[in-house]
Regions:
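Short acidic-hydrophobic catalytic motif
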Residues: 1-124
Length: 124
């Protein structure tokens, strides 16, 4: 619980504006999310993030947002693990086995949970 639970969600800077327009990051802030600057940004984008989110980026910056420090060097992987644990908990029963996930996300996790529920319906 101390190795997985503290892992924050993360997103790529290139996705932030789209997520915001879809209303998907209403509770997101620099305390509960890690922003990975995956693309060089221009002055127009710098102003957008400053005005909309109060975040000051610098043109051409890449990597983690300047003031952020990862809680673990592999924090994004740990958060994906946390997502998987949470999504599979929706089954309402423990999984007696080993799960390996590659490039997982909520959509795939939920589909996997549905498949398990269908396959083992007599045990639910």
């Amino acid at each position: 619980e101390k190795q997985i639970a503290p892992a924050r969600t993360f997103c790529l800077l290139s996705e932030v504006a789209g997520l915001e327009k879809q209303g998907l990051i209403k509770g997101g802030n620099l305390g509960n999310a890690v922003i990975i600057v995956d693309t060089a940004i221009d002055n127009k984008e710098v102003e957008f993030f400053k005005e909309r989110f109060g975040i000051k980026f610098y043109e051409g910056t890449r990597g983690l947002y300047k003031s952020q420090i990862l809680r673990f060097k592999n924090e994004p992987v740990r958060h994906k693990t946390l997502d998987l644990i949470g999504d599979l908990a929706l089954l309402g029963k423990p999984i007696l086995g080993h799960v390996t996930a590659i490039k997982s996300g909520h959509k795939g996790n939920v589909e996997f949970a549905k498949l398990l529920r269908k396959e083992f319906k007599d045990q639910f």
